[in-house]
Amino acid sequence: MTSARRPAAPRQNVVLTASAMLAATFAISPAAAQTPNDDFARRQAQQAEQQRLETLGRMTPKPAQAEAQAPAAAGGKKTGPCFAITHIEVEGVGQFSAAAIDKVTAPYANRCVGVGEINALLRDLTHLYLDKGFVSSRVYVPAQDIAKTKVLRLVAVEGTLSDIYINGKPAPGSGVLATAFPGMKGEITNLRDIEQGLDQINRLSSNNAKTAMLPGKTDGTSILNVENKPEHPWHLSFGNSNLGQEQTGYSKSSASVGYDNLFGINDQWNFAYEHSGPDYPWRDDGLGKSNSYSGNVSVPYGYWTFSANGSWYEYDSSVPGNFGPLQTSGDSKQLGVGADRVIFRDKDSITTLNSGLTYKETNNFLLGNKIEVGSRKYTVGDLGISHSRRMLGGLWVFDLSYSQGLNLFDAVAPGDAGAGDADPRFSKFTGTITMTRPFELASQRLEINSIVTGQYSPDNLFGAEQFSLGGYSTVRGTRETMLYGNNGFFIRNDLVWRTQPFAGNAELAKMFGEFRPYVGLDYGRIASQARYRIDGGDMFGWTVGGKLAGGHVNFDIGYSDIFGGTVDRHDSGLLFVSTSVRW
């Protein structure tokens, strides 16, 4: 009993000594002082980036069918009588410069042209409009005496949009139409504007909208009809995987709820909860536990999409100490806003500007005492550009972004205890290229999925801002994140066999989707930086597995391992299982 009461003063010394040691670790090298807070922040950023690029890929226009008949060349075969023409006038043009029109008409001027060539000229001018997305515009030949004037007069009717219907009926007060197609009534009908608005409506998973053009009430006008029969607006998802880490438990369980069009303005709401811990009935499945809560909302307005997001994360774990394990804990929160703008789209591609502002706060504790070196507030501004394109038989997405630490919202200053040796006013560049290439082999549907991601910063970064390798989302083959640094890259490649074993049963196909066996090969490298005590290194990983995807039930099982590189590990490969059910 006496010995149980006496450790009060020694325990205080243990706390102070351990705190000093941990503080020194944080101060010396953020890369060596990674916490569950840092891992959660990186994972959140990776998931948000993946979701954004997947959404951009889905919005990229599908390949159009080839034209059945190409426009005739100006020098083609003459049919019937020809007319001597000195020049050509095109009236009613408001969307193109005189030089653009002259480029099309010049080959037909100062020559004798027949009816076939006049029709070819009409097609060329019409295609000029179609290539810009002006699908309801046309060019025709008015009554005239060409033989007398030697001038060919043409008239362009630049069709305008008089109204927008939903399911064949006017919808004057519709917030759905107001946010998807703002300012389009009375303007020239532009297919790109229609595609953009349709993408904004179908951004919500409950929608499956299609559009059709109806004749307007006056000449030269059209009505856009949006056909949509939304499914239930709410969405639920539950899942579990064994992809957690030792510090916070191997079991990761999640639940999420979403709601579409809550306020009738194409708004999308999502809330999620995730818990990790040693929750499996067997031993050796981690030490600590964690809980996270997150939410986001997005609202479109034509070519703009505005968003807000937030998250809260907390963990309890332990670290080795001289006298036994030491209890650690921490929490972090994040609040952000964003604005994306589609700046260009055509029949093959979309280009988007992305911007965001995020406030981040992190607290870490040892034996209940706050570790100042590992606790901080900081703010990051982001600006980027994304481009998706269908080319070379596949879908390509390119993304480049710049992040800057800002002196906003009580952000930690350089040299403060919370900053350690990291620079709170850091700058960093990140780039990503993804490629999805379907092909057939022996009548089987196969697909290659590749991603290359890299990061560069001239500064020393907080752990949450660093680049990491290891775990399921980067170089596969380990449960834990193995390498950290300010600069690095990784490459992931998957060969997927897309089978449809449930194609003969509509209900089973809806429930389970496709079965997709796959093999993967990954490589990543972290650059060494001696001045920041970052050793760097590289790692190779391989994966083999199979998944159910595309239905209400998603299931992924496989095995991955490291087969090369500089990482020092003592465990064997990872057998992983992940499952989720959504409605």
Model region roles, listed by residue range:
Residues S241-L243, S276-R283, G321-L326, F365-V373, ...:
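Extracellular loop and loop/strand-boundary signature of outer-membrane beta-barrel proteins
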Residues M213, F238-N242, A255, W269-H275, ...:
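Transmembrane beta-barrel strands of outer-membrane/channel proteins
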Residues N363-F515, L521-Y523, A527:
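C-terminal outer-membrane beta-barrel translocator/porin domains of Gram-negative envelope proteins
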Residues G220, G249-S253, K289-Y293, D331-L335, ...:
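Residues that define the transmembrane beta-barrel architecture of outer-membrane proteins
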Residues Q268, W282-I385:
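Transmembrane beta-barrel wall of Gram-negative outer-membrane proteins
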Residues S3-A4, Q34-G244, S256, E274-N291, ...:
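Periplasmic polypeptide-binding modules associated with outer-membrane biogenesis and secretion
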Residues V257, G546-V553, D571-W583:
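Outer-membrane beta-barrel "beta-signal"
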Residues W234-L236, F263-W269, G302-A308, D346-T351, ...:
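Repeated loop/turn-to-beta-strand initiation elements of outer-membrane beta-barrel proteins
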